[in-house]
A protein has these predicted regions:
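Mid-to-C-terminal alpha-helical segments outside catalytic/metal-binding sites
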Residues: 3-4, 12, 22-23, 65-106, ...
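Divalent metal-binding pocket/active-site signature
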Residues: 1-53
């Protein structure tokens, strides 16, 4: 996917603004489902070159009758010219990503993509739906306040509105922390650990970075 960009640049991060995260959850699930049906090995089941045309003609004659079989030469000619005339050099849609197992898709997608979500968007809960998302993944939803737009009549109520998702049991307090803080740190401080230096959240960022490093060492 995307020309294998996250395989070639594993530390590169991408953030999508004002699109929510529901579509990201769908893309993530679809990537895995498509890989299962169209990976480099399975795709051969769909390769026109592997079609037994003689057997297909026999089956059409046997079950379709003479009327249908009389059109078989025409159909076969169209099939030959249409199905095998423009095959790509590489049949594996995921070749650029060098996917060997489903888990590779998770590792090349989840840490690399982040999704700006407005505080009044209930579908951002999908990002944290570990019982639904493949591999129990939680995607990188980010708080996008949308301040100054019509849907934010009072800028002091943005976080309060986001907290309603916790009150309504859509997300946990841990997920809320990731949504409003943790995922932003992952995005902007992953390549520049000092990104938040000199800001009011510097000490909290340092604390989270230390906890993350300790957790990774323990694995």
């Amino acid at each position: 996917f995307l020309g294998g960009v996250t395989r070639r640049f594993p530390r590169m991060r991408f953030a999508f603004l004002e699109g929510g995260v529901a579509w990201g959850c769908s893309v993530f699930a679809d990537l895995i489902a498509h890989w299962e049906k169209r990976n480099g090995n399975v795709i051969q089941q769909l390769n026109p070159a592997n079609l037994d045309r003689t057997k297909l003609g026999e089956l059409i004659k046997q079950y379709g009758g003479e009327k249908m079989y009389s059109r078989w030469p025409e159909f076969e000619a169209q099939m030959i010219s249409g199905m095998g005339s423009a095959l790509p050099d590489e049949l594996d849609d995921f070749a650029a990503c060098k996917i060997e197992k489903k888990e590779d898709l998770r590792d090349l997608f989840v840490p690399n993509f982040y999704f700006g979500c407005e505080s009044d968007d209930p579908t951002l809960n999908y990002a944290f739906a570990s019982k639904v998302n493949p591999f129990g993944a939680k995607l990188g939803a980010l708080l996008s306040s949308d301040i100054s737009h019509f849907d934010v009549p009072d800028m002091t109520e943005v976080l309060e509105e986001a907290w309603e998702l916790v009150e309504e049991k859509g997300m946990s307090e841990e997920d809320f922390h990731a949504f409003t803080f943790g995922n932003a740190v992952k995005l902007w401080a992953s390549l520049n650990p000092d990104f938040f230096k000199g800001t009011v959240v510097e000490s909290q960022v340092r604390k989270l970075q230390a906890e993350t490093a300790q957790s990774e060492e323990a694995r």
